[in-house]
């Protein structure tokens, strides 16, 4: 019973939405696109994502229908291995953008921005 109380105590140390949490907001939530045309998604963090080591740990992930998420971009603008160069990332501090220069049919899916500067 004592162990259970200790575990519960540890779980209660992190309260989502508390002042130290970083909240990520993406816009638009959905967007119709035209094949061959550019598209972009914006992501804003509630506080700077610059880590104490000087890096900014902002990543973009793509989840195609029926598949797990895959990493597209890491540390703002670095394309992961095998990611086409039509994908690019930019931004700094709290504001970031994922751009697709020419949308292709295989780009359909859900896109996520993710920070790894701060963990609960």
Curated annotation (Swiss-Prot):
Region (Complementarity-determining-1): 44-59
Functional note: V region of the variable domain of immunoglobulin light chains that participates in the antigen recognition. Immunoglobulins, also known as antibodies, are membrane-bound or secreted glycoproteins produced by B lymphocytes. In the recognition phase of humoral immunity, the membrane-bound immunoglobulins serve as receptors which, upon binding of a specific antigen, trigger the clonal expansion and differentiation of B lymphocytes into immunoglobulins-secreting plasma cells.
A GO biological process held by the record: adaptive immune response
Localisation: Secreted; Cell membrane
Subunit description: Immunoglobulins are composed of two identical heavy chains and two identical light chains; disulfide-linked.
Protein name as annotated: Immunoglobulin kappa variable 2-24
Species for this entry: Homo sapiens (Human)
Region (Framework-1): 21-43
PROSITE patterns membership: IG_LIKE
Framework-2: annotated span: 60-74
Keywords, comma-separated and alphabetical: Adaptive immunity, Cell membrane, Disulfide bond, Immunity, Immunoglobulin, Immunoglobulin domain, Membrane, Secreted, Signal
CC terms in the record's Gene Ontology section: extracellular region; immunoglobulin complex; plasma membrane
Region (Framework-3): 82-113
Signal peptide positions on this chain: 1-19
Occurrences of domain Ig-like (ranges): 20-120
Region (Complementarity-determining-2): 75-81
Name of a matching Pfam family: V-set
